[in-house]
Amino acid sequence: MISPCSPPLEPPVPPPETPASQALSIPLPPLPLNLPELAFPPSSFQASVPPPPPLPPPPRTTGFAPPHVFGLEKSQLLKEALERAGPAPGSREDVKRLLKLHKDRFRSDLQWILFCADLPSLIQEGPQCGLVALWMAGTLLAPPGGTPLERLVQVAMERGYTAQGEMFSVADMGRLAQEALGCQAEVLCGGLGGPNRDHVLQHIVAGHPLLIPYDEDFNHEPCQRRGHKAHWAVSAGVLLGVQHVPSLGYSEDPELPGLFHPVPGTPHQPPSLPEEGSPGAVYLLAKQGKSWHHQLWDYDQVRDSNLQLTDFSPSRAADGREYVVPAGGVRAGLCGQALLLRPQDSSH
């Protein structure tokens, strides 16, 4: 997460071997007191005694337990709970479920066009949300097979972008993406609104991913906490409310009347983008590292959350852990910024 992150686990130090002089011994059973009454002589009795059982393993040394990793237990519990809930749904099925769930939010005076690239899900280990979001985006950018998350973590640490997995700089995230994924990276400054808005929407309509820092609410949706809950998400889908759907290259959803999709493999005319002053006309489909599922966020809500990332969390500042924060702090590293990623051979 942009929130504090766990230091990498170190392999536990094996316990020292138990010297032979300290080996445990199992005493033989005591001889009966009245040997003459036995049917066999003492020598025969001793010969019939079975050999002692093997020695038990030496006790574990208690002084070399693995170091405590902040947040790991919580993230493991989250992963186990999500795994018990069942397999992660396919991307398209998950999006369809989400749209059905929220269909009452959509303005009835508009028709809706969905552009959405398939993104896998990955649950973060501790607060590595930015690197997890980059990994998800990388599946649309890197060669088949993608780039392992471990590689992203390794490069980020080697370059000094992170101490524990945290990423407080959009510029550093862009440099990491270029090196580790071999893609184009454009740092967007000045917020997601104004002249940047159409640029962002056209980027997603073209099927390219967008990395967004924002403040995370309890339900993972954007909120405004002045950067104290800074988090990362990736968006590769957008739902546009338009007055008219272009006639070329779109088909209506059979289950959701009024929703249209571009027909795969068919040229389609780009729609007219909703005006910025039109409320409830643009929604981003986003994923982040604490859920298997897509979320549907009002574009203006994301814009406003991204634009107020100004302060480093006081609880992080007091927790005694090391963080890599750029000169100028959270405001300089995250506020009003986002990262647009494209394959290396893509034109703008």
Curated annotation (Swiss-Prot):
Residues 34-48 have a biased composition (Low complexity). The active site is at residue 129. It comes from the Eukaryota. The keyword Zinc does not apply. Residues 121-241 are annotated as: Peptidase C39-like. Transmembrane segments: none annotated. Residues 1-18, 49-60 have a biased composition (Pro residues). GO terms for cellular component: cytoplasm. It holds the Pfam family ACTMAP-like_C. Keywords: Aminopeptidase, Cytoplasm, Hydrolase, Phosphoprotein, Protease. Belongs to the ACTMAP family. This is Actin maturation protease. It comes from Bos taurus. The gene is ACTMAP.
